[in-house]
A protein has these predicted regions:
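N-terminal Rossmann-like FAD-binding beta1-loop-alpha1 element of flavoenzymes
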Residues: 17-40
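General structural feature for long, well-ordered alpha-helical segments within catalytic domains
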Residues: 25, 29, 80, 113-117
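N-terminal FAD cofactor-binding segment of flavoenzymes
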Residues: 32-38, 42-92
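Feature captures the FAD/FMN-dependent oxidoreductase FAD-binding
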Residues: 85-128
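Short helix-loop-beta connector
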Residues: 13-14
Length: 128
C-alpha cells in the first residue's frame, strides 16, 4: 500500500521522471516506475566516465560479490530482502536467479547479475 500511494502521488505530479545513477536503487526505481506507466530517463555516467572499482558499463554493477549480505530472516538484511520480495523487487529476483554459494549470504555472479539488470532496463519501452 505504501508504494502504491507514493507512485500515485508521483504519477499525478509528472508523466516522466529523470533518475540519476543506474546503480541498485536507480535501476530498481526506474523499473518500478516504468512498470507503473511512468516514462523514465535513466542517466548513468559509465561507461563514458569509468571508476576505479567498476569493470563494465552495466547497470547495478556490484563491486563485491557478497554485497547483498545475509539472507537470515532474523537479520536486518534478511528482513529487508523479505520486504523486497513482497514488494516485487526486480533486482532481488535477478539476484536470486544469479546467486552463487555463500553460506547464509546472498552473493551473486556480479557480471551475470549486472548484465541481467541491464537487459531488463534496456528492454523496457518506457525507460530511455
Amino acid at each position: 500500500m505504501r508504494w502504491s500511494l507514493c507512485f500515485a502521488i508521483l504519477v499525478g505530479m509528472s508523466q516522466s521522471v529523470t533518475i540519476v545513477g543506474a546503480g541498485l536503487a536507480g535501476s530498481e526505481a526506474a523499473l518500478q516506475l516504468a512498470d507503473r506507466g511512468v516514462r523514465v530517463r535513466l542517466v548513468e555516467m559509465r561507461p563514458k566516465t569509468p571508476t576505479p572499482v567498476h569493470v563494465t558499463g552495466c547497470c547495478a554493477e556490484l563491486v563485491c560479490s557478497n554485497s547483498l549480505k545475509s539472507e537470515k530472516p532474523d537479520s536486518a538484511a534478511g528482513m529487508l530482502k523479505r520486504e523486497l520480495a513482497e514488494l516485487g523487487s526486480q533486482l532481488y529476483a535477478q539476484a536470486k536467479l544469479h546467486a552463487v554459494p555463500a553460506g547464509g549470504a546472498l552473493a551473486v555472479d556480479r557480471t551475470a547479475f549486472a548484465e541481467a539488470v541491464t537487459a531488463l532496463v534496456e528492454a523496457h519501452p518506457l525507460i530511455d
